[in-house]
Amino acid sequence: AIKNKSLFNQNTGLDKKLKKSHKIEKLWHKAKKLIPNGNMLLSKNPDRFLPNLWPTYFSKTKGCYVWSLENKKLIDFSVMGVGTNILGYSRKEVDNAVRSVINKGNLSTLNCPEEVSLAEKLVELHPWADMVKFARTGGEANSIAVRIARSSTNRHNIAFCGYHGWHDWYISANIKSSKNLNEHLMSGLNATGVPKELKNTSFPF
């Protein structure tokens, strides 16, 4: 986060380029009344950056560019879709592949053959792995890894560094001190709702 926003604005001129319109402000205030935190991901929350200047919403994307609702073209210097768009936004080959799957039907209670193909490719790329387990989110994947580690070692304490989601094993690091996750997730996060029995089982470094 930038502490001296006025100095930042003076040096970059962003205050003139990105000043939020009434439409965007109204939409963001509405979102915060309907959705806890305003959206589903902390990493996409504009309040973490420049609350009065950050575009907040996009209308379209291409390559390394995003367009705000006011159609202002900007270079995405953040994390390109929370790290998922490593090839850039709206990559033709990727878009065509996605459309092809959608046209065939992208959801069923049956298994899709692509799952096996992807697992095979991942094992090929990572010879240290014998099998692959898919998860819906990074937080879920981390929780699976923690459970496997605890099961195989018969030990319960976990040492970690960085952001690992919102599951109890991770947030429990803040039961002892609300400052434990300051450099990993966010400052002063309260561990309310996390079982107190998990205290002293997760340790950030």
Language-model features: locations:
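Active-site and channel-lining beta-strand-loop segments
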Residues: 55-77
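Short, contiguous pre-domain boundary segments
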Residues: 7-15, 48
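Active-site-adjacent loop/helix segments that line or gate small-molecule/cofactor pockets in enzymes
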Residues: 17-60
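Conserved active-site and cofactor/substrate-binding residues in soluble primary-metabolism enzymes
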Residues: 22, 26, 61, 89, ...
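PLP-dependent aspartate aminotransferase-fold enzymes
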Residues: 120-205
